[in-house]
From Swiss-Prot:
It comes from Pseudomonas syringae pv. tomato (strain ATCC BAA-871 / DC3000). The modification 2-(S-cysteinyl)pyruvic acid O-phosphothioketal is found at C117. It is an enzyme of class 2 (transferase). Signal peptide: none annotated. This is UDP-N-acetylglucosamine 1-carboxyvinyltransferase. GO terms for cellular component: cytoplasm.
Length: 421
């Protein structure tokens, strides 16, 4: 198993390019199954989950054509099987996203219950209930979701999400694009990745209004055609590198990104004492060598502070001046990295869904273990500022969400290297 070794104490300085958003690319790849012609998706990040999704398509009989820039052309007309097997699905929660498109386009699907990060309960019942509202007949047996469309296809439905669900919104929106009649999704997720998926569906000919608000209206169409589409930049990768620069007292310019979808994070970085400047597709952060000030953070659905940036801000508070509270309202069990940070000397108390972080001037390098994707990013950030060497184990978690993390950090001056397991 690969490990990262990081020697801390270097002030980050430089420029990097941001990759395409994994959380946008995965639903967009799933949505290509709705097309009745070839579709090209550009700006895919080079990540394990993306490779797994493309491999899943290969198992179904679709032969994706990939170029060296990781654009992929997919022609779903060659599909031979409508089963998403457990051995592929178990490593990736996003595999549930093929359920809606397959039922809508081909009338049936068999998808293994998904795996992925071990963060609390992420139930798939909203996906199932949404499709049932559209007339699908669904059984969950033997670890598989088996779904069939009614005769004549899925029907438009009015569906209210009991809790805001990004993948639930995406799955039902995709299915509704080819359903008969109008669907209205209430309490829908407003995340930029949902908007990106809607824009891709619209590029294929879907009729969707209200993406980015909590009510999305979809008028089903008979067919969706070919399209070429560029995946949006990754706002969480963007935020992670900005926090890394802030923690080390450095300066970084991130390019090929979008400041408008990261406003809650940028405001908190300014509150921590960072100088932040933005352009149309870039953000520059400069700490001028200062130590950050501790900030209070409360996660909530977009446009509020994103849960996927919570762990990084615990790292920021751990070396900041003062004390900051980080309240997690989206997922339970999302403070697993705190116990690894204790090994580096961080002063963090967890009380329920709140982490109280008292900043310390010095963290010490130590052997630590990544527990999930974003938690592993927080360990990397802490290691960048710690005295001595930090060895991070189980970094396959990092590779699920960050493209070439060591190369990008090296470009900013970090002393980081990968050691093959």
């Amino acid at each position: 198993m690969d490990k990262l070794i990081i020697t801390g104490g270097v002030r980050l300085d430089g420029e990097i390019r941001i990759s395409g958003a994994k959380n946008s690319a995965l639903p967009i790849l799933a949505a290509t199954l709705l097309a009745d012609g070839p579709v090209t998706v550009q700006n895919l990040p080079h990540l394990h989950d993306i490779t797994t999704m493309i491999e899943l398509f290969g198992r179904m009989g679709i032969e994706p054509v990939i170029d060296e820039k990781l654009s992929v052309e997919i022609d779903p007309r060659t599909i031979k099987t409508l089963i998403a097997p457990y051995e592929l699905v178990k490593t990736m929660r996003a595999s549930i996203l093929v359920l809606g498109p397959m039922v809508a386009r081909f009338g049936e699907a068999e998808v293994a219950l998904p795996g992925g990060c071990a963060i609390g309960s992420r139930p798939v019942d909203l996906h199932i209930r949404g499709l049932e509202a559209m007339g699908a007949i669904i059984d969950v047996e033997g670890g598989y979701i088996k779904a069939k469309a009614p005769e004549g296809g899925l029907r438009g439905a009015h569906f209210f999400f009991d809790t805001v669900s990004v993948t639930g919104t995406e799955n039902i929106m995709m299915a509704a694009s080819l359903a008969n009649g109008r669907s209205v999704l209430e309490n829908a997720a407003r995340e930029p990745e949902v908007v990106d998926l809607a824009n891709f569906l619209i590029a294929m000919g879907a009729k969707i209004h209200g993406a980015g608000t909590d009510t999305i209206t979809i008028d089903g169409v008979k067919r969706l055609g070919s399209a070429t589409y560029k995946v949006m930049p990754d706002r969480i990768e963007t935020g992670t590198y900005l926090v890394a620069a802030a923690v080390t007292g450095g300066r970084v310019k991130v390019k090929d990104t979008d400041p408008t979808i990261l406003e809650a994070v940028l405001l908190k970085l300014q509150e921590a004492g960072a100088e932040v400047t933005t352009g149309e597709d870039w953000i520059e952060l400069n700490m001028h060598g200062k130590r950050p000030k501790a900030v209070n953070v409360r996660t909530a659905p977009y446009p509020a502070f994103p849960t996927d940036m919570q762990a990084q801000f615990i790292s920021l508070n751990a070396i900041a001046e003062g004390t900051g509270a980080v309240i997690e309202t989206i997922f339970e069990n999302r403070f697993m990295h705190v116990y690894e940070m204790h090994r580096m000397g961080a002063q963090i108390q967890v009380e329920g869904n709140t982490a109280i972080v008292t900043g310390t001037e010095v963290l010490k390098g130590a052997p630590v273990m990544a527990t999930d994707l974003r938690a592993s990013a927080s360990l990397v950030i802490s290691a960048l500022v710690a005295q001595g060497d930090t060895l991070i184990d189980r970094i396959y978690h990092i590779d699920r969400g960050y493209e070439c993390i060591e190369e990008k950090l090296q470009m900013l001056g970090a002393k980081i290297r990968r050691v093959p397991g």
